[in-house]
Swiss-Prot record:
HAMAP family in alphabetical order: Oxidoreductase_RutE_HadB
Cofactor(s) annotated in UniProt: FMN
Protein name: Putative NADH dehydrogenase/NAD(P)H nitroreductase Lcho_1290
Family named by the database record: Belongs to the nitroreductase family. HadB/RutE subfamily.
EC class name: oxidoreductase
Keyword NADP: yes
Molecular function per GO: oxidoreductase activity
Keywords: Flavoprotein, FMN, NAD, NADP, Oxidoreductase
Length: 197
């Protein structure tokens, strides 16, 4: 990869992108959700384990199941979002290793007896993939509102029952209303956050 992205792209992904809490009344096309996955899935993970799992909440019935499980302060903005994505991590990601890592013979069987390692790997790599998911959404012209304020155990029971998936983040998706933004908070500068050794 030899070409840096232009300033417009960097602005859309990073410097001008915001976490949105208010949403314009504009639908998100279903095919855009498929595009989002097809883009985000290419981000790197350890051993290509790819533990991220997503439930896109769009319909009224699914919304009615999710909204009571959100923290009170997150319910109204979640109800207003065109799409709500529940981002989970599959602790049993090893079941897909023959497909994801065909070069690693026996990986599924080795991980089967290592639940603690699978838990740790799913946490780290699921979080990585959640970041890729947000950047992919921004790249496709969507705004994001990621949140941690929800009853994770209840969401697991409601949306991931019978699986080893554990909820990490609920992320509202759509076209944000800039009127709902507060002034942008600062970030740490290079000298505070980094060192060159």
């Amino acid at each position: 990869m030899t070409h840096a992205l232009d300033t417009l792209a960097l602005n859309q992904l990073f410097t001008e992108a915001r976490t949105h809490n208010a949403w314009r009344d504009e639908p998100v096309a279903p095919e855009l959700l498929r595009q989002l996955h097809e883009l985000a899935k290419w981000g790197p993970t350890a051993m290509n384990c790819c533990p991220l799992r997503v439930r896109f909440i769009v319909g009224a019935e699914a919304r009615a199941r999710l909204l009571p499980l959100m923290s009170e302060g997150n319910r109204a903005k979640t109800a207003a979002a065109p799409v709500i994505a529940i981002l989970g991590r599959d602790v049993d990601f090893h079941q897909h290793m023959p497909t994801l890592a065909p070069h690693m013979a026996g990986a599924r069987e080795r991980f089967a007896d290592q639940p603690a390692q699978r838990e740790a790997m799913s946490q780290l790599n699921g979080a990585l993939e959640a970041g890729y998911f947000i950047l992919a959404a921004r790249a496709l012209g969507l705004d994001c509102g990621p949140m941690g304020g929800f009853d994770a155990a209840a969401v697991d029971a409601e949306f991931w029952a019978g699986t080893a998936v554990r909820s990490m983040i609920v992320c509202n998706l759509g076209h944000g209303d800039p009127a709902g933004l507060r002034p942008r908070a600062p970030r740490l500068d290079f000298d505070t956050a980094c060192a060159v050794l």
